[in-house]
Amino acid sequence: MIKQEKKKKSIGRMIAGILVKVLFIVLFSLVPNLIPASWAEFYHRNMYGYVSFLPASFSNLFHNSLTELIVVAGGIMLIILSVVFLVELIRRIISKTAGRFVLTVLKHVLTLVLVLIILFDLMLGIGYRRKTVYQYLGLRHGEYTYDEYLQVLEWSYNGMVKARRNIGQDYRGVGHTARSFEANAKYANSLINTVSVKYELPLSAAFIRSKPVAASHYWSMTGIVGMYDPVFVEANINTDYIDITSFPMTLCHEICHAKGLARENDCNLMASIACIHSKDSEYMYAGYYFIFTSLYPVVKEYAEQEGEIFPDYFSYEDMAPVIRDMKASDAYWDDIHSTELSRFIHDIGRESNNLFLKSNGQEGGVATYHVPDNEYVDFYMTYLKGAKNA
């Protein structure tokens, strides 16, 4: 009787411990939505750089993606452990000790989940509650005329085609990077640091070693070109096709996540600003290209509404190499998504990302990657109008 009572108490304590862990998991899962903005701001201004130092430093020791290694090796281990678990569970059922065994396994699994959620909150989740880059820059939404919108579009077009003239081409006339992946990763990191200091943006100054993903070709089926892993503070980059129109932006975007920015549109705004401030033609090209292609449909529609004549940019001679780059990029993605399976995987990847963003308070889901077009106009009017390079 005494042994049975002790056993019941032991099981009771295990159940209580499990319930406590479940409670903490729920609470920490709500952090990105509930933590006061002032707390998030204090954390990122004063603590994030120190808290992220250890995992970032560990990740920087490796040139290969730790995230990819864990996904591949972890997937294999999960299959093996699942088989072991089922065999042991059957044995325990026969010996009538299955209940305690299941509770023990559940306890360890919940401990791992809790640790991962805490790491997620510290390295990314809290960042959803801090100020936006737009606010840090002190920008204000203005009411702009068609001519002012066109002025910004012209500025981005001129910057784009000017930078494109200085980029090397392959035999098809398609632009390509002149640097190795590692050299690009180092340059992008220093570029984000430089621009964040210039505009007094509170980002971590830590070195972030971006990682190429070996299985990039298969990863492309999801339509994802970059991913930040908050557990390792690791920027993972798809290298199956080094798209000259977007590769520098992708690098800068993922590095921005690792340096403390959580929102997707913040990372895109910061990345585009960093790229146009670069002295390197490849980065300038990608930054101006991103802004031009974002503004183009908006300004064109504005012209139609106002009855204005909209410039036919795509007929300009300087636009020809840009069009070749665009067509090469489209051809790659058309080939990747040419099968039913790849399109299905793409839809799954997009919906998973959509749910992830919404669960972290980003109501627009994947639409939050889009930077509102007027933010580029606000930035130009505030910082660049009248400048020598504007």
Give residue ranges: language-model regions.
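Post-HExxH zinc-binding segment in Zn-dependent metallohydrolases
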Residues: Y149, A262-I309
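Membrane-embedded alpha-helical segments of integral membrane proteins
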Residues: I25-L89
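Auxiliary, metal-adjacent structural segments of Zn-dependent hydrolase domains
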Residues: G168-E234, I244
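Internal/C-terminal transmembrane anchor helices
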Residues: F101-Y128
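Membrane-interface segments at or immediately adjacent to transmembrane helices
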Residues: G125-T194, W219
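Pan-zinc metallopeptidase signature
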Residues: R324-A390
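Active-site recognition of the HExxH zinc-binding catalytic motif
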Residues: H63, S246-N268, S272-I273
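Cytoplasmic juxtamembrane regions at transmembrane-helix boundaries
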Residues: I2, K7-I11, F85-T111
